[in-house]
Amino acid sequence: MEKKLRTASICVQGGYQPKNGERIEVPIIQSTTFKYDNSEEKAMLFDLKKEGYFYTRLQNPTNDAVAQKIAQLEGGVGAVLTSSGQAANFYAVFNICEAGDHIVTSNEIYGGTFNLFGVTLKKLGIECTFVNPNDSEEEIQKAFRPNTKVVFGETISNPGCAVLDIEKFARIAHKNGVPLIVDNTFATPINCRPFEWGADIVTHSTTKYMDGTASQVGGVVVDSGNFDWMANAEKFPGLCTPDDSYHGLTYVKAFGKMGYTTKLVAQLMRDLGSIPAPMNSFILNLGLQSLHLRMRQHCENAQKVAEFLHNDPRVAWVHYSGLKDDTYYELAQKYMPNGTCGVIAFGLRGDRETAIKFMDSLDMINIVTHVADARTCVLHPASHTHRQLTDEQLKEAGVAPDLIRLSVGIEDVEDILDDIKQALDKI
């Protein structure tokens, strides 16, 4: 049945099929551990010779059902839920890389991920080179080293709203024998499925559109199952050589297309944790059931708001790839012809203080450290999410000092516009 389901049906019924007499909603298995009748059966679980559950830090039925739904939405072979989007990006990379390795990433990425790659991974011995995603393939190629193991980008960047040329990045990654990881948080699988354009691994902050209600923090790593790890086995010893902590088991040989996600659970979750609480996964699943409907409304509202801002003389610039004169319009039409997301980046005529005054004058629109929610939200990245970055780093990350990030919700668009208009009148 699962293979025949279309996107909207997967949102509602994917990942979990109740049997006769069972509850129709994904059950909340709020338990740390699971009972077995004999020691041998439990031992087989620890040796990865049998499927099943023994400790929620590694796997839990509620988490797995929701992860499977997201894997279906993205067209992947498997997925693992994490406790946050940051954890998802960390695990996606760290499941491949180790000390002495190097990654190449677009510089148009979320500030937290920018710090994760540029500062935290460096402490673990993993170097990172940031590239301009708009550069030519030849220019980006210069960033690669013999020890490069991963290429990373965001489908739609946070907060700059740049659209990644996924096919170009996939070509460059595969030319160098490494996988492409794409953070698909803003587009969601409703509007873009990166695997169809050559990406190998997809991540999400499920806190955002997938939840849609600001009720839980979470993330997910989804594997396409398409990358041939053994073709460049020397680059990926963690996946292609025996793991001493599992009696010499080799993940790719033992689990095939599921080798990547199996290693993430069996090794990283075992050693580092970061699994979501089953209750959070249950809440996430409730959000997923309406994702296809909400994304349509987000995009419709954002298009109208972007057009209004674009035509207002008090607005200096607008970045929204649904606008025909936007730099990324053609890429958006290629990868997301049915809509991009509800996030708009724009700047007002004036200085940094003008942006702050505008935000402080808003009434219905919320100033919060959040984005991609049912409620319309606003933030000044240079003062908030990217506050730790220097002016040079802000420039490198594509964050202008006057940039305002407006996350358009699913309220009545006329109410959203009324609030923006009255705030503009006060600057």
Model-derived segments and spans:
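Short hydrophobic/aromatic beta-strand micro-patches
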Residues: 222, 345-347, 407-409
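Short loop segments at secondary-structure junctions
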Residues: 33, 223-227, 348-351
